[in-house]
């Protein structure tokens, strides 16, 4: 009988632990529901705010790609799908350059990314002739910017 008495409290302890985990889970489940209700209630208020709030602008390079295309080939157009691909390509290249330049700054224990880190990152990321042309155009752009 004594062993059975000991087992019962042991069985109750996990049950109590389960209840506490259930109690912990219940508020977690209720929070998303409350979160879902807030936008619905705020939906009518947000509808009033939407008039005040302008639509978020998405920054793209589409106009710049188009300008460069017209400089190089004035008689050629570009489809929206191709423009999207070019925009993604430029975003990817800039992301790689930013990662490489931040890595270089970290290696040299510098808190600031300067034009030197960007130039070195361009040389590391872009291949051969493309890197040389990019560096010369970048140097020209920085010189023009600082002189004006």
Curated annotation (Swiss-Prot):
Covalent cross-link (Glycyl lysine isopeptide (Lys-Gly) (interchain with G-Cter in ubiquitin)), residues: 144
Comp. bias intervals (Basic and acidic residues): 1-32
PTM section of the record: Can be acetylated to form H2BK6ac, H2BK33ac and H2BK34ac.
Signal peptide coordinates: none
Key words of the record: Acetylation, Chromosome, DNA-binding, Isopeptide bond, Nucleosome core, Nucleus, Ubl conjugation
Single GO molecular function: protein heterodimerization activity
InterPro entries: Histone-fold, Histone_H2A/H2B/H3, Histone_H2B, HISTONE_H2B_site
Pfam families listed in its UniProt record: Histone
SUPFAM superfamilies: Histone-fold
Residues annotated with N6-acetyllysine modification: 7, 36-37
Protein family per UniProt: Belongs to the histone H2B family.
Its job: Core component of nucleosome. Nucleosomes wrap and compact DNA into chromatin, limiting DNA accessibility to the cellular machineries which require DNA as a template. Histones thereby play a central role in transcription regulation, DNA repair, DNA replication and chromosomal stability. DNA accessibility is regulated via a complex set of post-translational modifications of histones, also called histone code, and nucleosome remodeling.
Protein name per Swiss-Prot or TrEMBL: Probable histone H2B.1
Organism of this sequence: Medicago truncatula (Barrel medic)
């Amino acid at each position: 009988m004594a062993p059975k008495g000991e087992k019962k409290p042991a069985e109750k302890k996990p049950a109590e632990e389960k209840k506490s985990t259930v109690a912990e889970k219940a508020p977690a489940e209720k929070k998303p529901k409350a979160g879902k209700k807030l936008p619905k209630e705020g939906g009518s208020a947000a509808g009033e705010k939407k008039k005040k709030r302008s639509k978020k602008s998405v920054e793209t390079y589409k106009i710049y790609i188009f300008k460069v295309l017209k400089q190089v080939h004035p008689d050629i157009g570009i489809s929206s799908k191709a423009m999207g691909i070019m925009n993604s390509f430029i975003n990817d290249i800039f992301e790689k350059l930013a990662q490489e330049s931040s890595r270089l700054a970290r290696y040299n224990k510098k808190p600031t990314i300067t034009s030197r880190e960007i130039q070195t990152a361009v040389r590391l990321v872009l291949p051969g002739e493309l890197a040389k042309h990019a560096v010369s155009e970048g140097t020209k752009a920085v010189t023009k910017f600082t002189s004006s």
